[in-house]
């Protein structure tokens, strides 16, 4: 068993030169229990299948306009009062935020390896899966900048996160017939 697929996604949340990305995936399976050499063992093991898969997806959920140099408007209590008299506060705009012009998709790669076993004519089934998920290019603050600059570091695709785990399922599916 073999399956391959791919996605070509675009998002307006990124600069035009990084808007589009390709995300491939595939899986392979081998049902050993259907092979001729395994037939003698089917008395003990009704089903034996090995599985593996790998896939990459993209994450565009980074916030709006993260790649544009925008200025923040301060109003109300955050306005300045030293320009006028009394309790009057005036709106003002802050310094443009720093941006990374190469901001792009976070990519999430998942690897999965598994085995399916069936016993007692598939009344008892055991499934085991091991997986690893790695997120590359996570949005994170960039290198620290001198405080005299007056702006915080631009966010960039600098982070990585890896999770690993396993899953074991055991189930019994016997059908009892009415004795009447």
Where are these regions (language model features)?
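Extracellular/periplasmic, surface-exposed regions of secreted and cell-surface proteins
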Residues: 1-180
């Amino acid at each position: 068993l073999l399956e391959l697929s791919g996605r070509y996604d675009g998002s307006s949340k990124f600069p035009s030169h990084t808007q589009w990305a390709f995300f491939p995936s595939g899986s392979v399976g081998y049902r050993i229990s259907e092979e001729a050499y395994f037939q003698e063992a089917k008395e003990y093991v009704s089903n034996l299948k090995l599985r593996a898969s790998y896939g990459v997806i993209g994450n565009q959920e980074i916030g709006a306009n993260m790649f544009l140099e925008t200025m923040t408007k301060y109003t109300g209590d955050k306005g300045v009062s030293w320009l006028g008299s009394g309790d009057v506060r005036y709106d003002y705009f802050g310094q443009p935020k720093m941006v990374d012009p190469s901001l792009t998709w976070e990519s999430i790669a998942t690897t999965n390896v598994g085995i399916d076993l069936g016993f007692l004519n598939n009344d008892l089934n055991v499934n085991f899966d091991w997986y690893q998920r790695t997120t590359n290019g996570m949005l994170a603050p960039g290198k620290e900048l001198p405080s005299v600059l007056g702006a915080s570091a631009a966010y960039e695709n600098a982070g990585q996160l890896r999770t690993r785990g396993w899953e074991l399922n055991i189930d019994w599916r016997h059908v009892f017939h009415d004795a009447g």
